[in-house]
């Protein structure tokens, strides 16, 4: 069974991705700061159909200095790591002029520095194993911008540049690196949207609807599978045609 790390996977989009990968035959190793009721319920359900395929590792990904030891532990506990989904992230709502430097640094640390450092150490395991898959979760705001999300948008744009450059670095080692850029997905990060905001977003999209967690999970699952063996350095948008 191939092992895939999913960061920020205790709830919402990350957990949806983990569950989809498990359904496709992968072992999902979820990294998050703490367990959630949503994860515990999913674990009980998954154990009935795919025993031993969903695991939890408590870790604060903002602790950059501890990431090398985390990577070593996961390799020791689960063997070679086949896939990595850099999904963990955070945002701050508000215009840049009113955002503190500490808030900016916090978002950049978790959304940009952390996935880069984790990837650095996990990719070494992939190279030693002869291949692997990396999927970075970006966002359409990296392309479109969004008022009040300038710092968040900057971090997601950096992940896209990281994806394309890393794909060229590690391609010869049999490692595919891609990104998925979701539109506004119904998760905790979008709970602050009013119903009017949701309707506006839906009206702007070609398909006149918002995106579900399952839509994004399907894209990640495709990029982890054999059907995407010749796809690398690519960004797949899952936004119901919002950026069409």
Roles of regions detected by a PLM:
Residues 10-12:
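Conserved glycine-rich cofactor-binding loop
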Residues 116, 209-238, 243:
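C-terminal substrate-recognition "lid" of short-chain dehydrogenase/reductases
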